[in-house]
């Protein structure tokens, strides 16, 4: 069966693994998932990620990040733009997550950017997800 929303599947896997305090989580890989993982790493939500090449297909593995007391660095993830209801934002109305404490991941003409990067560059696009 084909997957209708691979990004939502990725976010659900990360959320479930984080809630269960797993150290790593694996999923099928794609370019957009690797770009989302890169943003999560840059923003300090995950420790690292690797793309492993297998015989069947590529696998993306994320190393989740926790504090010394095993408190999660990802408090929440939410898919915003869905296949049935796309959400777009202009460069002047880019959303802020928790007053700037979280990150909005936005697909722009210049690739995937955070809300802060998109504001700096003056570009809008499709709001993929919120991370806080």
From Swiss-Prot:
Entry's InterPro entries? Ribosomal_uS8, Ribosomal_uS8_sf
Q: Which GO terms describe its cellular component?
A: ribonucleoprotein complex; ribosome
Pfam (any one): Ribosomal_S8
| Gene Ontology MF terms in the entry | rRNA binding; structural constituent of ribosome
Q: Does the keyword Plastid apply?
A: no
Q: Name one GO biological process term.
A: translation
* UniProt keyword terms in alphabetical order: Ribonucleoprotein, Ribosomal protein, RNA-binding, rRNA-binding
Could you tell me what this protein does?
One of the primary rRNA binding proteins, it binds directly to 16S rRNA central domain where it helps coordinate assembly of the platform of the 30S subunit.
Q: Which family is annotated?
A: Belongs to the universal ribosomal protein uS8 family.
Q: How does it assemble?
A: Part of the 30S ribosomal subunit. Contacts proteins S5 and S12.
- What is this protein's name? Small ribosomal subunit protein uS8
> What species does this protein belong to?
Corynebacterium glutamicum (strain ATCC 13032 / DSM 20300 / JCM 1318 / BCRC 11384 / CCUG 27702 / LMG 3730 / NBRC 12168 / NCIMB 10025 / NRRL B-2784 / 534)
